[in-house]
Structure formats: structure tokens, C-alpha cells
From Swiss-Prot:
The lineage of its organism: Eukaryota, Rhodophyta, Bangiophyceae, Galdieriales, Galdieriaceae. Although originally identified as Cyanidium caldarium, these sequences derive from Galdieria sulphuraria. It comes from Galdieria sulphuraria (Red alga). This protein binds to 23S rRNA. It comes from the Eukaryota. It is found in: Plastid, Chloroplast. Part of the 50S ribosomal subunit. This is Large ribosomal subunit protein bL21c.
Length: 110
């Protein structure tokens, strides 16, 4: 089993070929190929490589599947004994990407 842990927008994601992840919105078209080069950890066969902070020469290739809005986050504010209540909602834009492969500059791992 080959997998990698990548960093994108300050968040870490467990990725392996054939899986999809939901990340913050990326300004690209559906069907475009993108590369993540901030790889924190790579496991291939029985070899584990940890970056300090990132692993050089490793890229994760992904394809953009769709853009969508995430679930609504509700923020509720209330002042006790005053009778004031406020509810606000927010839906962030997200992008779903399909992990196609984990690539090395010399050869393709998977």
C-alpha cells in the first residue's frame, strides 16, 4: 500500500491513489490536473520517508472532479438577560480532487 500525507492550505490530508479528498477552493477548471509538492510523509512498500519539513522530488498528481459548497456552519450569539439573539450561517467553497498517482522525479511510484 502506497500512501502520502500532504499539506494544503494549512491542513494535512492522507492520500493514496484512487481516493478523493475535499480541499479548499482552487481556481482551476474541472478536469484540470494539479500537483501537490508539499509532501510530509511517504510510505511505499515497507519504506517510510519523513520530510523535514517536506520531501524533495515527490509530487502527488490529482485531477479536479468538481467544485461545491460545504455544509453550512451556524454561528449563534446570545446575550443572556437581554433578549438579543443572532444566528449567522456560512458555507465555504470546496474542491473535490481525485488522487491519480504519487510521482517521484526519477520514476512513478504508483
Amino acid at each position: 500500500m502506497t500512501y502520502a500525507i500532504i499539506e494544503n492550505s494549512g491542513r494535512q490530508f492522507f492520500t493514496e491513489p484512487g481516493k478523493f479528498i475535499d480541499i479548499n477552493h482552487i481556481k482551476a477548471e474541472v478536469g484540470d490536473i494539479i500537483y501537490f509538492n508539499r509532501v510530509l510523509l511517504l510510505k511505499s512498500n515497507n519504506l517510510i520517508e519523513i520530510g523535514y519539513p517536506f520531501i524533495n522530488n515527490i509530487k502527488v498528481k490529482a485531477k479536479i472532479l468538481k467544485h461545491f459548497k460545504d455544509k453550512k456552519i451556524r454561528v449563534y450569539k446570545m446575550n443572556p438577560k437581554k433578549g438579543t439573539r443572532k444566528t449567522k450561517g456560512y458555507r465555504s467553497l470546496c474542491t473535490r480532487v481525485l488522487i491519480e498517482s504519487i510521482e517521484n522525479t526519477e520514476n512513478i511510484i504508483n
